[in-house]
Swiss-Prot record:
Tissue specificity annotation: Isoform 1 and isoform 2 are highly expressed in placenta, pancreas, and small intestine. Lower expression in colon, ovary, testis, prostate, thymus, spleen, kidney, and liver. No expression detected in heart and brain.
GO cellular component, one term: nucleus
Record's protein name: Zinc finger protein 468
Domain KRAB intervals: 8-80
PANTHER family: PR DOMAIN ZINC FINGER PROTEIN (PTHR16515), ZINC FINGER PROTEIN 154-LIKE (PTHR16515:SF57)
InterPro entries in UniProt: KRAB, KRAB_dom_sf, Zinc_finger, Znf_C2H2_sf, Znf_C2H2_type
Disulphide connectivity of cysteines: none
Length: 522
């Protein structure tokens, strides 16, 4: 990513200390300072961007109060095609800077020593290959003020980084009357007293200056403030190519996730419960299962104090209080609180019945309905009443039965305030007020309020008599007719007149008898 041409200094990445601050740093912190600044400088040198860097340090020469001022300036003027710049050849040319010493005859001190080197991406053939590109010039200047007897000429054997490292290493012996400054041109002091400093001062300042992230991943465009973090991040992209499931093609960013996923295909379940011996494919599933044995329910609802063994169950339960229904049907826009409810509802639109009974071949649109149907074949009745030990094949039947013992009748008619123990009885009762007769005979168009009444009526047309007396073999079309007939054999007369105490086997006979006492004539 090309940066705009201009001057880039150490301002955002350099650290500045006053003499009081520097005295508070221990040797380890000063060493850290030198390492950080050296690494920073090397990074800037290696970047192919237009930049100017100035490094200015102060150190004691050990010769009285004489001080040495090291000033390093790096000018780099980028070409128009910075991506084509050949830094490999520059690295070769960095060796051998010319040090020129000029003596100031007027004061007897050494005049500024300057090392100047023009660095081009290449010379000769390389310039021809990159015709049209401007030459890239690096000038590394350093000025020293020393009491020297005579001028000297040096030939540098090291690279830029080595020269800077030498300057920074000298910074550990700072004079008490001077300060260390890594700033370009302008001199800004930080006024901190000795009491305000602490051992983490260097670390805190470094974190502030390193907030600017300059290392960017070309794949995900994430930025990092040092190259080591970028390299660590790039491992993720490398593993993305390696962590792919051979069966379904699903990709994972870590190998351990891929290993867990493969158990879905192999059926491997390495995690076993010590209590019941049940095995699981994931350790997290085993952890959740163990809560069934311990009875632990650490997740409590703040609204109703109900507790749950799983956090996901608590989150799902909260929707009861909030009324949230995040799952919406795309066909009819009906919303549901749970994804499982939406899945069941969707089958109503498709008409799909994917669950088949292996015994009778009957199909169902829900797995729970198939499981309930299986109990008809097996005779299983897993739900038992604690009061009378009566058993039921469905939980809803047990709940309904319990109301017999408790006398609870939660369903109330809004018209007449009559109460019922079953919702179905309330719905049936409401038809008395509305006059609704939803069940219609296809033969004679006669309508009925109850489906059982329609079924009985249809036997008039078919002549079917499915109810047979075990005593005499007589058959009947309605079960009520069979019950009345059986009283002929048993002699049972359950209907009694309150006036004279006479009993009857049929209710209709008792009603007819009442007219004798009342004088009513039908």
């Amino acid at each position: 990513m090309a940066l705009p041409q201009g001057l880039l200094t150490f301002r955002d990445v350099a650290i500045e200390f006053s003499q009081e601050e520097w005295k508070c740093l221990d040797p380890a912190q000063r060493t850290l300072y030198r390492d950080v600044m050296l690494e920073n400088y090397r990074n800037l040198v290696s970047l192919d961007i237009s930049s100017k860097c100035m490094l200015k340090t102060l150190s004691s020469t050990g010769q009285g109060n004489t001080e040495v001022i090291h000033t390093g300036t790096l000018h780099r003027q980028a070409s128009h095609h910075i991506g084509e710049f050949c830094f490999h050849e520059i690295e070769k040319d960095i060796h051998g800077f010319e040090f020129q010493w000029k003596e100031d005859e007027t004061n007897g001190h050494a005049a500024p020593m300057t090392e100047i080197k023009e660095l081009a991406g290449s010379t000769g053939q390389h310039d021809q290959r990159h015709a049209g590109n401007k030459r890239i010039k690096d000038q590394l200047g350093s000025s020293f003020h020393l009491h020297l007897p005579e001028p000297h000429i040096f030939q540098s054997e090291g690279k830029i980084g080595n020269q800077v490292e030498k300057s920074i290493n000298n910074a550990s012996s700072v004079s008490t009357s001077q300060r260390i400054c890594c700033r370009p041109k302008t001199h800004i002091s930080n006024k901190y007293g000795n009491n305000s400093l602490h051992s983490s001062l260097l670390t805190q300042k470094w974190e502030v200056h390193m907030r600017e992230k300059s290392f960017e991943c070309i794949q995900s465009f994430k930025s990092f403030n040092c190259s080591s973090l970028l390299k660590k991040h790039q491992i993720i992209h490398l593993e993305e190519k390696q962590c792919k499931c051979d069966v379904c093609g699903k990709v994972f960013n870590q190998k351990r996730y891929l290993a867990c996923h493969r158990r879905c295909h192999t059926g491997e379940k390495p995690y076993k419960c010590n209590e019941c011996g049940k095995t699981f494919g994931h350790n997290s599933s085993l952890f959740i299962h163990k809560a069934l044995h311990t009875g632990e329910k650490p997740y409590e609802c703040e609204e109703c104090d109900k507790v749950f063994s799983r956090k996901s169950h608590l989150e799902r339960h909260k929707r009861i209080h909030t009324g949230e229904k995040p799952y919406k049907c795309k066909v009819c826009d009906e919303a549901f609180a749970y994804n499982s409810y939406l899945a069941k509802h969707t089958i109503l639109h498709t008409g799909e019945k994917p669950y088949t009974c292996n015994e009778c071949g009957k199909v169902f649109n829900r797995l729970s309905t198939l499981a309930r149907h299986h109990r008809l074949h097996t005779g299983e009745k897993p739900y038992k009443c604690e009061e009378c030990d009566k058993v039921f094949s469905r939980k809803s039947h047990l709940e309904r039965h319990r109301r017999i013992h408790s006398g609870e009748k939660p369903y109330k008619c809004e018209e007449c305030c009559k109460v019922f123990s079953r919702k179905s009885n309330l719905e049936r009762h409401r038809r008395i007020h509305t006059g609704e007769k939803p069940y219609k005979c296809k033969v004679c168009d006669k309508a009925f309020q109850r489906d059982s009444h329609l079924a009985q009526h249809q036997r008039v047309h078919t002549g079917e008599k499915p109810y047979k007396c075990n005593e005499c073999g007589k058959t009947f079309g309605q079960t009520s007719s069979l019950i009345i007939h059986r009283r002929l054999h048993t002699g049972e007369k359950p209907y009694k007149c309150n006036e004279c105490g006479k009993t009857f086997s049929q209710m209709s006979s008792l009603v007819y008898h009442h007219r004798l006492h009342s004088g009513e004539k039908p």
